């Protein structure tokens, strides 16, 4: 039996056609720990963070969390957030090594996406598609890794406070964002780090710039997955603009869960897309 597992930054709680499990990450702020599972109220999380003046941060899934997720199956595909900005992939690999000591017959492959959110969703959907074709485990791994090279990520943020506080971007870069409606448009680099590409003022200019960046990155009407942190209007406007260029494009919008809401902050929009 095949099982697909991803950390909670994929923003998925289920996936049609496969056995899927999300392994939660944790957001810590002051005296509160917010476990990023299906019970988390992301609106409450964002409100709490907006009122919180102290330090905050995130924690990757525990070794035990991964080990429990591995149980009950013999073929496992694991999808993680970029290893360049998180210890999640390393914790999954450590758990795999422990699990295989007592379950040597189980096959476990870990995909370090060098990305997050919607690009992880695209990979999950591709794995489900390949599994439905009845392909062998090793072939699925190979084809999925090839597919990952054809997907990309852009995002627009109204604030870089939490990213800067946790060392993901420089505090100098974060300082100018959010002032007078300035948004930052960025991408996931080939190394899985955050690469700013443009500053925009206002939602309309940000949307137009995002569409232009996708087109420049050779987007030709493939799948698009848009995740947002309480900004359905911007997500919808982006989808409508892309449909204006490619009316038949498969575009899906969903809200961010806890981890992506923490780093994208309220108003952030994250876009994963295919260029194949």
Predicted regions and their residues:
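Acidic side chains
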Residues: 7, 11, 36-37, 74, ...
């Amino acid at each position: 039996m095949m099982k697909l597992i991803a950390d909670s930054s994929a923003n998925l709680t289920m996936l049609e056609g496969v056995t899927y499990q999300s392994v939660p990450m944790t957001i810590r702020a002051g005296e509160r720990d917010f476990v990023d599972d299906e019970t988390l109220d992301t609106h409450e999380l964002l409100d709490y963070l907006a009122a919180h003046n102290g330090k905050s941060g995130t924690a990757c899934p525990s070794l035990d969390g991964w080990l429990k997720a591995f149980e009950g199956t013999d073929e496992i595909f694991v999808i993680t957030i970029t290893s360049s900005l998180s210890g999640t992939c390393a914790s999954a690999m450590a758990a795999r090594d422990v699990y295989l000591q007592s379950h040597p017959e189980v096959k476990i492959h870990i995909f370090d996406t060098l990305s997050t959110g919607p690009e992880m969703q695209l990979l999950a959907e591709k794995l489900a598609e390949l599994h439905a074709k009845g392909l062998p485990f090793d072939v699925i791994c190979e084809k999925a890794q090839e597919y990952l090279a054809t997907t990309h990520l852009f995002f627009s943020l109204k604030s870089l406070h939490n990213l800067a506080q946790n060392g993901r971007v420089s505090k100098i870069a974060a300082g100018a964002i959010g002032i007078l409606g300035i948004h930052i448009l960025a991408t996931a680099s080939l190394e899985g780090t955050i690469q700013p590409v443009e500053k925009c003022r206002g939602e309309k200019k940000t949307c137009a710039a995002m569409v232009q960046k996708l087109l420049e990155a050779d987007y030709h009407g493939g799948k698009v997955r848009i995740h947002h942190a309480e900004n359905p209007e911007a997500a919808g406007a982006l989808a409508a603009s892309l449909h204006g260029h490619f009316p038949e494009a498969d575009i899906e919008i969903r809200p961010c869960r806890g981890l992506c809401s923490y780093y994208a902050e309220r108003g952030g929009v994250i876009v994963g897309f295919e260029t194949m």
